[in-house]
Design a protein with these regions (language model features):
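Aromatic/acidic, Gly/Pro-rich catalytic loop(s) in extracytoplasmic/lumenal soluble domains
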Residues: 1-31, 115-117
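Short, flexible coil/turn micro-motifs enriched in small/turn-prone residues
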Residues: 6-8, 38, 227
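Intrinsic disorder/low-complexity detector
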Residues: 8, 41, 172, 256, ...
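Extracellular carbohydrate-recognition regions
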Residues: 16-67
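Intrinsically disordered, low-complexity peptide-like regions
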Residues: 31-33, 54, 252, 299, ...
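Active-site-proximal, structured, solvent-exposed surfaces of multi-pass membrane proteins
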Residues: 45-305
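Solvent-exposed, low-complexity, intrinsically disordered
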Residues: 297-321
Length: 321
């Protein structure tokens, strides 16, 4: 096994401006989602991910049609020809990794290829296979490699599935400003939650807030059943990004306690208690009924024996003289 230290890790919780509670995520652009989230957390207005435009596009044996929901359908013009691809040419704005994402609701497998534009024009080398896109685990942001500022790259997407079709709303290519991201992480690491106690359903820690009105943004999923206190006072957690717990803070040092008891746990205790009480009542009822039955049976036996004695004839044994 190999273990790697992440120098940019922010831990279980970090101090944030309350604007994180107002962030609404887009369904179609994960790059801008990350920009919005990180800027809200850090109180910055930076472009950590920067979109680079497509400066040229070409298609071979491809026809298109527009769907009413904003998707474009790509399919072979002539199905007897095996090749069917779309090329996008982009120019790097900085030394960076290049990332690609094609938003869609209709996943159809495609193959992705990449090549330096000068090499493509020269024709001396074949395109490099970058991987498969869409379908299952392959439908995510794709890292196409690390390139340098000013470099032009050709990205080819080939329709490669039995349906002979592909759909996407847009073609997104982004670079990443790692240095700016790392510096922001270093600043945020100064005000993260220091966990002092941790159990399956309990967490305790401290965090310092420089400003009044700040919140603690956590990576803990929001769910009913949490009891949270800040400096001994019970508080109500908010939900951020439609999924994660956010806790209001006071200016200065904050001692946080979080205890989880799911709603069904209380219900199950009530049901269990009712069941136990019912069993006790049944036992007592059966116990008392058993004593009564013994008396009834004893009386019945006594009556039967008395009746038997009363009806049995008495034979007198006399001798004739």
């Amino acid at each position: 096994y190999k273990f790697y230290n992440n120098p940019n890790a922010l831990g279980l919780g970090m101090v944030s401006s309350p604007s994180i509670e107002d962030v609404t995520l887009s369904e179609d652009n994960p790059f801008e989602n990350q920009n919005m989230v990180f800027n809200a957390l850090a109180g910055t207005t930076k472009e950590y991910f920067t979109k680079i435009p497509v400066i040229n596009s070409e298609m071979e044996n491809v026809s298109t049609s527009q769907l009413t929901d904003g998707h474009t359908k790509y399919f072979p013009t002539d199905t007897s020809i095996a090749e069917c691809h779309i090329d996008y040419v982009v120019k790097m704005d900085k030394d960076s990794y290049l990332y690609m994402y094609l938003p869609t609701k209709y996943e159809r497998s495609c193959n992705v290829w990449i090549q330096d534009e000068d090499d493509y024009i020269d024709g001396s080398e074949p395109m490099e296979y970058a991987g498969q896109f869409f379908v299952g685990d392959n439908y995510s942001i794709m890292n196409l490699g690390k390139f340098y500022e000013g470099q032009e790259l050709r990205i080819r997407i080939t329709v490669a599935n039995d349906d002979n079709e592909a759909y996407w709303k847009d073609q997104l290519f982004y670079t990443f400003d790692y240095d700016s991201f790392a510096q922001t992480c270093a600043d945020m690491q100064k005000n993260v939650l220091e966990v002092t106690s941790f159990e399956d359903t309990y967490l305790e820690g401290t965090v310092n807030s420089e400003n009044d009105g700040s919140v603690l943004f956590t990576t803990i999923p929001y769910e009913n059943g949490w009891t949270i206190t800040v400096n001994g006072k019970k508080v109500t957690a908010e939900k951020s990004l439609d999924s994660l717990i956010t806790i209001p803070l006071e200016q200065g040092e904050n001692k946080i306690t979080m205890k989880f008891s799911p709603d069904y746990w209380k219900v199950s205790l009530i049901i269990t208690g009712f069941g136990v009480a019912l069993l006790v009542l049944i036992f007592l009822f059966e116990y008392k009924r058993g004593k009564v039955m013994k008396k009834v049976l004893a009386k019945a036996n006594f009556t039967a024996e008395s009746s038997e004695k009363a009806t049995t004839p008495v034979i007198n044994d006399t001798n004739d003289t």
